[in-house]
Structures are given as C-alpha cells and as structure tokens.
Amino acid sequence: MHKGIMRNEHEHKLQVAICKWLDWTQDFYYYAIPNGGARHRLVAIKLKMEGAKAGVADMFWMVSNKRWKGLFVEVKIEKGTQQPNQKAFEQIALAHGYYYAVVRSIEDCESLIKRFKADEL
C-alpha cells in the first residue's frame, strides 16, 4: 500500500477516535471539514466549486474562551507534518481570532481542551 494512503488511513482512524472521545466527554458542537483525502476527480471538482479549500483544518470545535472565537484542529499521526497550505491556513485562522492546534492523540485533545477552557491559550 502507498505511504500516503497508509498515512491517511491512520489519520482517519485517529480522527474517528477523537470524534468518539468528543461525543463521550465534551458538551460543545464540533464538525469535520472534508477537504482532504483521495476521491474521484469529478467529486473533487464538485467540492471545489462548493467552496472546499486546500489547507483548511480537519475539524472545527465550536467552543470559545476569553481570547479565541473557536478552535480549528488539524489531525496528524506522530510523524505527520503540516503542508505549506495548512501552515498558511493556520496563520489566517489566528489572524481572524480562531485558535489552531495540531493534535496527534486523544491525550493531546484532552490537554488542548483543558487548557483552552481554562483560558491558558
């Protein structure tokens, strides 16, 4: 199997686990942003026409604190790195008052939301 496909599959499984954890432990609304992944060319064209943008984070957590309006979350496996368009989106999000975080585990999510809700970020 191709390395990129394996990475995407591992990130998929991690994001599914994160969603289950959020459902079990958190009381705020969140949603996935389906911009990435392999898909048929026509589907990709259709999504782009509907406003899909390269580099947008994997998830949005609709929770605010004293400083930030909400939280964009990029899911990466341990060795995963942000692409240039993801780094560009991070800067756009921060400039518009939204926190941006990269998570690699459920533990990262637990720490992130605890610190976020305590206004430590």
Language model regions located:
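Catalytic phosphate/metal-binding cores of nucleic-acid and nucleotide-processing enzymes, i.e., regions
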Residues: M1-L121
